[in-house]
């Protein structure tokens, strides 16, 4: 069984801030969001976590191994470097979806995302070190089979993008609804899913669903570890094995 720790990062009162005292330039907002995501990715990544941009004003991180002090440092860094603040809510559970539901619900109980009085809330309890194991996190790294030959070198850039996004949307919904997993597009033709302990058959079914629904062919590498970094690197190596052997599901060390 997995034991995933998920942190919801929600920018405080961000919508109203973008139009106060008057609407801000879109290019400035996009620049702020991308820089903030990059800084968060670095800050959480140095502690072996993963963060996904999701909607930018609401980001989702896998934070196994990060304690409350580490979360507070992240908040302090945002406050010191940006004209906005962020609330963080930690949830844990046997599935990533359950962990996120808990984190989201706790933050919603503190007030609206656009509540001017709710600032830098820090909620939830991380998994105690004594309860952590080397198998707490399962990461699945999907990519599109021959994306370059099928899309990039054959279609215009936007058509390629829409095909890959259609595959991502189909996978995201299926993995969440069928397996309580959280899947994120991470650029190129890559999708990272944070999963409970799924079988090879579960992944094969997901790949078949995307093929049938979106006509996009996927393969996947799967890894497990004590942190998102450990599991993610295992998944990357497994994906390389799948590419070399022309298979659709491989696991790091055949876990």
Swiss-Prot record:
Belongs to the archaeal-type GTP cyclohydrolase family. Its EC number is 3.5.4.29. InterPro entries: GTP_CycHdrlase_3 (IPR007839), Nucleotide_cyclase (IPR029787), Rev_trsase/Diguanyl_cyclase (IPR043128). Catalyzes the formation of 2-amino-5-formylamino-6-ribofuranosylamino-4(3H)-pyrimidinone ribonucleotide monophosphate and inorganic phosphate from GTP. Also has an independent pyrophosphate phosphohydrolase activity. It catalyses: GTP + 3 H2O = 2-amino-5-formylamino-6-(5-phospho-D-ribosylamino)pyrimidin-4(3H)-one + 2 phosphate + 2 H(+). It comes from Halobacterium salinarum (strain ATCC 700922 / JCM 11081 / NRC-1) (Halobacterium halobium). Signal peptide: none annotated. This is GTP cyclohydrolase III 1. Keywords: GTP-binding, Hydrolase, Nucleotide-binding. PANTHER family: GTP CYCLOHYDROLASE III. One of its GO terms (molecular function) is GTP binding. GO terms for biological process: biosynthetic process. It is an enzyme of class 3 (hydrolase).
